Amino acid sequence: LLAGTDETPGNIVEKDGTITCGKIKIRFFGVTHTIPDSMGIILETEHGWIITPGDYKLDQVDGIVSQEEEKEYSIFDKAKVLLLMTDSTNIENEGFSLPEIKVHQGLENLIRKVSGRMIIAAFASHITRLAHVVKFAETLGKKIVLDGRSMKTNIEVAIEAGLFKPKKDTIIPIEEVND
């Protein structure tokens, strides 16, 4: 909705869902990311497909893509793909980025080792990663302070959407932090 305008109709879409716009079929497919429920878009035209996976991270360990992801991308095997619009962070670096499981393990090791205050910087959109940090901190009886409007808003939305449920007193306001 745009401020000051009438309500604009919208469509709620799911992974594997489709909508039609004129002669173009718009299809959605799931992608792996630290943002829950991330999806790519396929524009199916009479000439072939135009694809954008959006923001994604291959779910892989040691360069081997997961079976779930292999299955998800198999929809492209027999398709006539005209254009794939994608980008890659750190493309100039050889190899793969760390698998999310290893990122989680690294964070767990750091959180476990630090006895005092710890500051973790993260993208506010990395909900899965942030939820993991909160859950692990809970197992150790540690408190979490969120700072930044986007960080607070995204976590509130994730909690309201049922993506994770922190214990009542795990996330505290910054004013409750002792010097």
Predicted regions and their residues:
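His/Asp/Glu-rich metal-coordinating catalytic cores
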Residues: 1-178
